[in-house]
Amino acid sequence: MRVVVSIGGSVLAPDLDPDRVAAYAEAIERLAADGCEVGVVVGGGGVAREYIETARELGANEVELDQLGIGTTRLNARLLIAALAGGANLSPATGYDEAAAALRRGEVSVMGGVTPGQTTDAVAAAFAESVDADLLVYATSANGVYDADPNVDDDATQFGSMSPAELVDIVLPMSRNAGASAPVDLLAAKLIDRAGIRSIVLDGTNPEVVVDAVLRGDHTGTDVIPTGSEEPIYWTGSSDA
């Protein structure tokens, strides 16, 4: 099974804790050992935001801020590559062809941001589409997709499952509200809808949750299920992991 895992920077390295990065590397290694082809996209998290806020105060324009954010995602990606100890590409892929080539070599393919104006949410969706991934997992700091921002609405209700089109409908109004926090960004949702990518949005604070979700479909997040989508092979009983 080919899977792309998007790990938020605030999930992987909220405080540059080496034990946390190592735990994520171990989880990814378990997926690879079980026969998965694994691509990983790493976000910038709080570190990126701090750099961006500082650079904005210094007068940097939006493209410069985006480039700074991309650089931070690649630093986080390098941390993960170091923890994977030779099982991944030597340096973060800077484009989709390079990332796909690493998969073809049998490596864990790790990348950060790619293009100014595009979040790592969207990068992960585009990467998954480009390699025809069976599954896309967003390991975030939120436990799935809600009908409203749970950070500001105590009555927000979580979806157990939804279609990609429904994901777009949920994310669209959040993308227009500067105070709202969408589970994935709008471009990512549209790419998932366009490509019909089976996806999961979950709380990735514990890396073991990602392993359970990929190998067994066992999680408490939200399944994004395209029409006619088949369950990944591991969920149909071909693996006892």
UniProtKB/Swiss-Prot annotation:
Binding site for ATP: G9, S10, G45, R49, T140, Y146, D149
Ribonucleoprotein among keywords: no
Catalytic activity: UMP + ATP = UDP + ADP
Positions annotated to bind UMP: G44, D66, V114, T115, P116, G117, Q118, T119, T120
InterPro entries: AceGlu_kinase-like_sf (IPR036393), Asp/Glu/Uridylate_kinase (IPR001048), Uridylate_kinase (IPR011817), Uridylate_kinase_arch/spir (IPR011818)
Transmembrane region(s): none
Regulation of its activity: Inhibited by UTP.
Superkingdom classification of source: Archaea
Pfam families documented for this protein: AA_kinase
Gene3D superfamilies listed in its UniProt record: Acetylglutamate kinase-like (3.40.1160.10)
SUPFAM superfamilies on file: Carbamate kinase-like
Main location: cytoplasm
Location in the cell: Cytoplasm
Chain positions covered by the region annotation Disordered: 222-241
GO biological process, one term: 'de novo' CTP biosynthetic process
Keyword Glycoprotein tagged: no
Subunit structure: Homohexamer.
Matching PANTHER family: URIDYLATE KINASE, URIDYLATE KINASE PUMPKIN, CHLOROPLASTIC
Recorded family membership: Belongs to the UMP kinase family.
Protein name stated in the entry: Uridylate kinase
